[in-house]
Amino acid sequence: MRNNHIVIMAGGVGSRFWPLSTPEYPKQFIDILGCGRTLIQLTVDRFKGICPMSNFWVVTNAAYVDIVKRQLPDIPAEHILAEPAARNTAPCIAWACWSIKKEDANANVVVTPADAVVMNPEEFRRVIGNALAFTDNNNAIVTIGIKPSRPETGYGYVETSLTPNPSPKGEGNEILAVSSFKEKPDHETAEKYLKAGNYLWNAGIFVWNIDTITNCITKYKPLIAEQMDKIVNDLPSDSTCYTLNSKLEEVFPQCEKISIDFAVMEPASKDAIVYTHPADFGWSDLGNWASLHDKLSKDADNNGAVGNVKLFECNNCVVHAEDAKKVVLQGLDGYIVSEKNGQILVCKRSEEQRIREFSAE
């Protein structure tokens, strides 16, 4: 446990949840479920018992550092990594892993987004524990694959072998070899994936030991590795690699803007070192209002609401009005209603893909 580290990626802006989520205060820092905890706090909660608080790391936008400190006061301030520029997930993860390796050469690491929802944290911890045991004993990358319940077109997929991995050291009987990664499919292809039985949703949660990931980045993206050496390893002994400094501000924005999936996962899967742990712990990436409606408790008319909300003759609505003193709605069918800081959205659920357009007006 003392060598386990958790990296939380918390730099996104969550523009599909406007007006709840804004560039100044995005969804990972909001109590979007109305449970008294923000999404990033829930993320930390579900990892408790897997590693000490001193081994948590957060990579975020420089503008959000103070929010992270307020919401997660037990995480060491030097473990809050402030990106000077958004360069997608590969440089973000590389920076965190190079920083961890400098502190703990025997680290075993879990990387997770800050804004996912897990309804069964006990099962989540069991799955993560299995994956950590596997990567502790193997030169392997494990991605958590969610067992699909529907032909979802909004997620990427992981194609797996149909039998457990052939030669694990230590625990790993539930872990399968990954054949390939698939981009978000159309509905017909998603139907085929569901019927095939060997495709899982890619949850964007990764587990590896520190040598495996740093070696992979060095092999597949050597320039990013060189840049991380400059940022983390080439600093003078009295400096810090965690806060904004001249070396970081100079080098990090030069990193290739690329996801960890394209930078590492796809080439590593061709080298047969990528595995997946199938899981069913009530996961959602909470990427849109439809997914929030799915996770909220519903009344008899299929309405989900957060806040002091009164509904009359309403059906199939999702309402979030935590800041408002009281919201009363009548006669709506299939609407999103949201209020935050004096801004109000009323939108048909069938038109939610236009919310970014509306918020830009």
Can you say where each PLM-predicted feature lies in the sequence?
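Left-handed beta-helix
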Residues: 2-3, 212-361
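Conserved core of the sugar-phosphate nucleotidyltransferase
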Residues: 121-168, 172-239, 243-249, 254, ...
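Short coil/turn connectors at secondary-structure junctions
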Residues: 2-4, 53-54, 76-77, 104-107, ...
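A short acidic, often aromatic-flanked loop/helix-cap motif at beta-alpha or helix-coil junctions
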Residues: 86-91, 150-152, 187-189, 283-284
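Conserved N-terminal catalytic core of the sugar/cofactor nucleotidyltransferase
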Residues: 1-9, 15-23, 33-113, 119-129, ...
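Residue-level signal for inorganic ion chemistry
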Residues: 40, 96, 115, 158, ...
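Short beta-strand segments
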Residues: 9-10, 59, 110-113, 143-147, ...
